[in-house]
Amino acid sequence: MTQSPFPDDLTRRPPNYFAFGGIDRSAHVREQEGWLDAVVARPDTRLVPVWRSRNLFADLGNRVMPPVAALPTVVEAGRLLDLAQEVVFLGDFQGIAHVAVDLSPLDEEMVGTMTGTWGQFSDLREIGPLIERFEGAVMAYARGLMFWHARHGFCGVCGSPTVSAKGGHQRNCTNPDCGASHFPRTDPAVIMLVHDGDRALLGRQKIWPQGMYSTLAGFVEPGESLEEAVAREVFEESGIHI
């Protein structure tokens, strides 16, 4: 069994469903030749399907039980590996490898035919903490990496095509005169709750469902402190100075 690299007390803290799932990302083995092929050949490896930034869930129609992630094994859904635009190793959890597969090129009818046995695709943000903690984290992880792959198919330095490397955690430029490597990165951002006593400042987008509101948020600009970003974003989104 793969030992988690994190202390047990971290997994017992109040959960962040989209960030910490205790998965061992095994970065030290990603460079080994043929390693990913061996991972996807294991019958018990679990697949984390992603389709156009949506994740696969089972039991969405059950109003009694909470939804659960649909994570079929290679034995059950190995054909998805042949259809995937990208195959990315996520890590090991309790001795089981988890691999994300991007099915975005498939149209809605085809993806429904290929995955309908296990569930249906839905927006993870709409389900959030209703699902089990590890499932939420691994689904967000898979969705984030596939989002990055979809937007870095070409080199930002010379414009040549890039190819996936190191289990899907790097993309390399195919131009021998360039050879740039690109990595997934998280942009710094602020999410803030502005309040005045028992009142809170919330915002919404026109496309959101009626009655849906959110705290304000935004990206941190170069050379800007977190506090400055909060003040700027609040003014930009609401016209209120803090």
Language-model-detected regions and their locations in the chain:
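N-terminal strand-loop-strand
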Residues: R171-S214, H241
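Short, charged surface segments at domain edges that flank catalytic/cofactor-binding sites
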Residues: P129-F147
